[in-house]
Amino acid sequence: MNAKIRKMLHNPAASGILIFLAAVAAMAVENSAWNTHYNAFLDIPVSVQFADLTIAKPLLLWINDGLMAVFFLLVGLELKREFLEGELSQPSNVILPVVGAVGGIALPAAIYTLINQGNPAALDGWAIPTATDIAFALGILALLGKRVPASLKLFLLTLAIIDDLAAILIIAFFYTSELSPASLMIAGSAIGTLILMNRLGVTGISGYMVVGIVLWIAVLKSGVHATLAGVVLGFVIPLKGEEPGELSPLHQLEDDLHHVVGLGILPLFAFANAGVSLQGLTPSILLDPVPLGIALGLFLGKQIGVFGFVWLSIKSGLAKLPEGFTWKQLYGVALLCGVGFTMSLFISSLAFEHGSSALVSGAPDMGSARLGILTGSILSGIFGYILLRFSLPKPPQ
């Protein structure tokens, strides 16, 4: 591979840029003569058979239920590593990001709920503006290069990881349909097997993957969202290798998945889910409760919630402002937390999966949700970048 291309792909901003380009491509195709081909592509039936078990889903659901399980596997690996040997292993490093994450979840959810309180069906989308897209937010921050203090980047990363953990819990508790006891028993047996393998010191990743596939199928059939199987699998992958100094299975798998997810799965997910039809679009549609609640939740709720809760915790003596960055820079990061994008799109697919892509006034469907997500995320990204660009130290001449 050309050295310049390799360097570009290893740039932290690469994933965010690809996700953005994929979303732009989806919107361009959806609003062109190729839109029927785009939707037909996402509706392609894909069947996989295991003995007598057949799983048949359109391609879109394979992306959302299957490939996104790989994304959540990576999230599970990162969470385990951070809690056991990373920044989250030190309680003093956790307080401020946790407080910020709580504010960044509570206020957006409250804003959305307040705006949509007259529509019970729309209330299912309350969690959509609570999410933060790690790859996109860090990608925007990476555009500012070495001007960004390490402590500021670490704060955003830690807050986003905690935000992901909250998203996992929200999906598990609030977006689970009717449960299948038989499938849950199989899933429980698979989890027990994975834990036993970990306890016995099994370090071969392939064995965990085989049992993980069984777990994914069981969770898929259980009524719990299948992506949670990825999180569970990530939690049981061993953190230590067989020999001292050897690359552990967790670190190896995390390294292997990092670029697959950031440069492949997330851009593909964005392309499959960001197609918004602009036909008949007028500014008034943004004032409909669903897109308005999501857009304001992401843009206003996130920045005020994150910054406000952090400010209160510091002023009350609960935490300290980390060395190396200022209040203005902290506010810029709070703005970047409003870039919900892929995570918000994912949660909206759970909340409004019954809806069409048509933008119907007041209807709780994917179309109106996507519009709100794109608006809130773009505004948060632009204003966050501008504020950080002017508040960070000037690069050396």
UniProtKB/Swiss-Prot annotation:
Localization annotation: Cell inner membrane
Family under the similarity heading: Belongs to the NhaA Na(+)/H(+) (TC 2.A.33) antiporter family.
Reactions mediated catalytically: Na(+)(in) + 2 H(+)(out) = Na(+)(out) + 2 H(+)(in)
Transmembrane feature ranges: 9-29, 59-79, 95-115, 125-145, 154-174, 177-197, 222-242, 260-280, 292-312, 332-352, 371-391
Annotated protein name in UniProt: Na(+)/H(+) antiporter NhaA 2
Pfam families, per database record: Na_H_antiport_1 (PF06965)
Membrane topology classification: Multi-pass membrane protein
GO cellular component assignments: plasma membrane
GO MF term (any one): sodium:proton antiporter activity
Keyword vocabulary terms for this entry: Antiport, Cell inner membrane, Cell membrane, Ion transport, Membrane, Sodium, Sodium transport, Transmembrane, Transmembrane helix, Transport
Domain of life: Bacteria
Role description: Na(+)/H(+) antiporter that extrudes sodium in exchange for external protons.
InterPro entries cross-referenced by the UniProt entry: Na/H_antiporter_dom_sf (IPR023171), NhaA (IPR004670)
GO biological process: regulation of pH
UniProt xrefs under Gene3D superfamilies: Na+/H+ antiporter like domain (1.20.1530.10)
